[in-house]
Amino acid sequence: GSGSEQVGWRPGLVFQNNVGNSHSPNVIALPLTSSIKKTSQPTHVFVKASDAGLKKDSMVLCENPQRMSKDNVGKYLGKLSDTCMRKVAEANLLASGAISYLDVVSLVTAWTKAVELNAVTSA
């Protein structure tokens, strides 16, 4: 069969480290859909509408990251809980397959770098 891509304007989850967010003209976003299907798929994360400023319950499609210009980003809707973001992070690692190439030491090294890249600094 043929592949599928999300089209049109839709909510998305900016899923990029803070350094990238502040220095790049682009963002990496994960699309959301209100079509709740394949809930057992490990790359899908359910988001309750009331927990995220959304109109409808939605699913984060972690297997379909999109790079987009910040000029194409719409309004801010809300922030996901740390618990939900952990689920998204895990689903994203599974979607990319990158985790299968890392041993425990490499995972800790990557985690340490991620903490540095996501540190919030005052300007």
Spell out what each predicted region is:
Residues 117:
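Cationic, low-complexity basic patches in intrinsically disordered or flexible, solvent-exposed regions
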Residues 49-114, 123:
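C-terminal terminal-subdomain/extension
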Residues 2-9, 13-50:
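Compact nucleic-acid interaction/catalytic patches
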